[in-house]
Amino acid sequence: MLLSDLVDLIKKGNSNFISSNIFEDLNIEDAASLDEAVNHQISFLEENNILKEKLDKSNASAIITSNNNEIISALKKLNISNIIVKNPRIAFAEVLNHLYKTINFNPGIHASAVIDKTAIIGADCHIGPNVYIGENTVIGNNNDILTGSSILGNVRIGDNNIIHPNCVVYENTTLKNNCVINSNSVIGSEGFGFIPKDDKWVKMPQKGGVKIMSFVEIGTNCCIDRPAVGITFIDEGTKLDNLVQIGHGVKIGKNCAFAAQVGIAGGAKIGDRVILAGQVGVNNRVKVGNNVIASSKCGIHCDIEDGKVISGFPAMENKSWLRSSSIFKKLPELAKKLRQLDKQ
C-alpha cells in the first residue's frame, strides 16, 4: 500500500490528523517497532517515547509521530517521511488493522462439534472442531467459537463475539455483544466459598451466574468465578490482561483495564475507568471508586475514593508511598545511628 494511501486512511481515523511530510511515496508493506523497522516499513514515535534517542538509527520508511518540533525537525534532517497526529498510538493501531487482515472463519458447524438438541445457534456462526454446546444455550449471530471450547447449559451469548480455543463458559453465564475471550480462560467457574466448621470446611454451593456486557476483552488463562447467589458482573468496555482472577460476586464498572496477575477477592466493587497494574490485589468486599489508578503489586485492603492514585502494601496515596519508600531505603543507616545513640 502506498504511503499516501495510508495517510488518507489515517485522515479518516480517530487519531486527529494534523499534517504529513512525504519525501518518497514508497509502498508500505509492513509495520515494526522504531528500532527494528527497515525499508518499506512504518513505525511510530510518541513524544515521551524512550526510543527518541534511537531515531537517528531507524531505517523506517515512514514514522507516525506527534506535533513535536524537535522530532519533526530530526525526521526532516534524516529524510524520513512522517505523519503527524495528536495520538500516534491510535494511528499506528489503525494502520496495523489495515496491513494485517484479521482471519475470518467461515460460517458453519464442524462435524466433530457436539451440540445439544435444545441449543439454538444463530446465523453466520463458526463452531469449530471439538466444540461442545450444552442444553438450552442460546447463541446469537456471527459468533466464532473456536477449537475445543465448551459452552455449558443455560448460557446466553449475543452477537459478534470471539471465543478462542479451549475456553470454558459455565452454566448461567451471559455474554453480550462484541466480546473477545482468549484461549484457556474460564468464565463462571465455582466461587471459592467454604465455611469453617469443627476444623473442617463445609462447601457453600455456588449457584449464581456471570454477566459480561458488550466490548469486554478477556486475556488468556483468566478465571471469572460465579457466586453462591446473584451474579459476578463486568460492565462494558473493560479489558483484562492474561492471568487475571475475578472472585465470586465481584462487580466491575465500565472501561476498566487490569494488567496481568491482578486478583480481586469476592464481593469487591470496582468503579468505572479503574486501572490496576500488574499483581494488584483487592480485598473482599472493598469498594474502589471511579478513575482510580493502582500501581504494580498494590494491596488494596480498604475502600478507595474516586480519582485516587495509590501505591504500596497496604495501599496509600502515591505521594505518601514514595516518601515512605525513600525512608525505607535509609532504615539500615537510621538503625545504625540509633544503636550508636543507645551506647552513649
UniProtKB/Swiss-Prot annotation:
Active site annotation, chain numbering: H248 (proton acceptor)
Enzyme Commission numbers on file: 2.3.1.191
Top-level taxon of origin: Bacteria
Catalysed reactions listed for this entry: a UDP-3-O-[(3R)-3-hydroxyacyl]-alpha-D-glucosamine + a (3R)-hydroxyacyl-[ACP] = a UDP-2-N,3-O-bis[(3R)-3-hydroxyacyl]-alpha-D-glucosamine + holo-[ACP] + H(+)
A single GO cellular-component term on record: carboxysome
InterPro entries tied to this protein: Hexapep, LpxD, Trimer_LpxA-like_sf, UDP_GlcNAc_AcTrfase_non-rep
The entry's keywords: Acyltransferase, Lipid A biosynthesis, Lipid biosynthesis, Lipid metabolism, Repeat, Transferase
GO BP terms: lipid A biosynthetic process
Molecular-function GO terms, alphabetical: N-acyltransferase activity; structural constituent of carboxysome shell
Pathway(s) the chain acts in: Bacterial outer membrane biogenesis; LPS lipid A biosynthesis
Record function comment: Catalyzes the N-acylation of UDP-3-O-acylglucosamine using 3-hydroxyacyl-ACP as the acyl donor. Is involved in the biosynthesis of lipid A, a phosphorylated glycolipid that anchors the lipopolysaccharide to the outer membrane of the cell.
Self-association state and partner proteins as the record states: Homotrimer.
Family: Belongs to the transferase hexapeptide repeat family. LpxD subfamily.
Name of the featured protein: UDP-3-O-acylglucosamine N-acyltransferase
Source organism of the structure: Prochlorococcus marinus (strain MIT 9312)
Gene name tied to this protein: lpxD
